[in-house]
């Protein structure tokens, strides 16, 4: 039943709708009022729950990992239905009073964006104990394609509009936030504080109610175990990874930038020579005129502004003129310099000399972890300059990187889910899966499969995981669309278990509206009921891909939690610092490296039992570049 009905607010006047007292009381406490704070802490200990919200303020001059400072904490006590708002003027006083409560493993923590809280509190010397409920993560598990703003979550699940419960509308409040540091008189200040107090009080009341409702909803869709035993324990792991960061040799990064600029200079001169004149290579209009009018290259696409010179077009023109290769390389180096040299430098923390990326678990629809500020997961590795960039990422002196990589995890998951006999056989016998595919499709003995044939089979194997089209395969392996179509057809005839899985999963998604991973991570696919053919095709690819990529992502998360716990248990001087798709990286002291390799291999290979074994390869290195 709607909360608005339950509190008899339907049909009442706006003034009554905004009446907070119908739901809970609000008290403001002073951080230096030791008796009152102690009384609050005793209540938290009795309830064994800390339902809280931290107000944070951006502060770019801070040298912290997260450039924000905590300005207030609001806490909700269920027993007396009271929200306590505490302004924090002295962060040390906050730390001394609340450290024990946050660290107490018997007290469950309920909040929102706990990953960020974890890092900020750890910087204050608080090692957060029992992270139990994060409203953002619960909303993500319930539906990975929606937004996770706390007010939107409260409105969606509790049908409470936060703005209906405060005096000002959103526009007025935002304008008052903008003027936060202006010379406001005390009444304006008090009014603003009152608004914040009410807003954050509704947040903590909402978090408590959300925990009750969302837990039931998670149970209904069989995802409570995923939330409780995978997603919530992962918060701490990702928080630790951000806190740990990755050391960057700043001087070497600057030198690398200089070498890129030199490379760009050389390429610029080569491009000018090959084109017979100087022009602005970064101007698509000028480049279009040079390529298609002066050099007379075939035109594939025109836009309102002129000729299209995007990567796809340039790739098609590669064999038409030697300048195209240089232009593609020029663009790659430009991107490397702007995104990964000039882009990385501001992220090096002055205190730690490390880059502390955010790792997100509520972004991708398949359950994969992503990273931002900066994104270390998409540093290009196909071009040599991109690979060389990884040389600037190093362990501290006396430490070493241990890198562990799942071997073909998505194909192993596909073999397990589809139960295709040929694929299962290849993995059980530790055969080269791509050689086997080429042999079956082309009808030739395995020992006769050429490098090129294996490469084509590899493109199909991995393409199947992503729902590749004949056009996509043709582009990738350089054959006609017809030939690519025949290849896919023959592949699916030989691997009939995979064909059946693909047909069945799309049909299932059409009927029930969603697909799931092996761990009941659900993804809704409304695209399958679209009137647009292209949208439906996207839906079909998502239906095929999500159970595979999503299950692989879940396995990686389980492995990360197990590795983290084992490193702690063994009391090793080692920490997880990076996760990129199927790869996990640890920085550890030289003496512990063999133990760490063993832990990584053991935890990752035994994260789940499939019909075929999971295989992990480990390596050690003195730079990220040297990792296999």
Each model region followed by its residue ranges:
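A common structural junction motif
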Residues: 495, 602-610
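Conserved catalytic core of nucleic-acid polymerases
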Residues: 186-187, 243, 349, 356-357, ...
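Nucleic-acid-processing active sites and adjacent nucleic-acid-binding tracks
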Residues: 76-111
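Short, conserved charged micro-motifs
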Residues: 93, 283, 591-598
